[in-house]
Amino acid sequence: MVSLEEILTQTKNTEFNNQYKTNMPSRLRMATLYGIAALNGNARISCNGNFSERLAGYFTLWGDGAGDFAPLAHLFVDEVVQLGIDLGLPKDLCVKAPSDGMSGKTDEDNLGFTYDELKKVYLGNTEEIAEEKIVKIQNRIKEYKGAIIGACAHYG
């Protein structure tokens, strides 16, 4: 078996791409949170992603997309913002450009469309959206992260 130290030594001179640099901190954070939860007995981890992010596949598998429960999973981004305002959270926390906090770009910069446009396409309200953007959004919705993980057939 190869040790973690050997693997890291072999990759020392590797140029890590932006996707790796963006996703790895989220995965390490989640592994750390689950480690802390294990040390604290019955602790559970909350996945705080929302429906817009899930629909666009804009989350890190085994990172911010993981958790034991997901209280915001059925809310679009605008509904999460309104919930925060209704709960009295600081406005600067609730009303800001969505960002992964790691790439230096907004979600809209990375996706090429807004969450409002995503919601409109999903709900069929596309009158004000250019056809090429509608197609881009529909294709994004159909990508692999939106699919249910398949189970292997059991033979025997």
Residue ranges of predicted features:
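ATP/NTP-dependent adenylation/nucleotidyl-transfer catalytic domains that generate, transfer
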Residues: 1-4, 9-24, 34, 38-44, ...
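Active-site glycine-rich loop that binds ribose-phosphate moieties when present
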Residues: 26-29
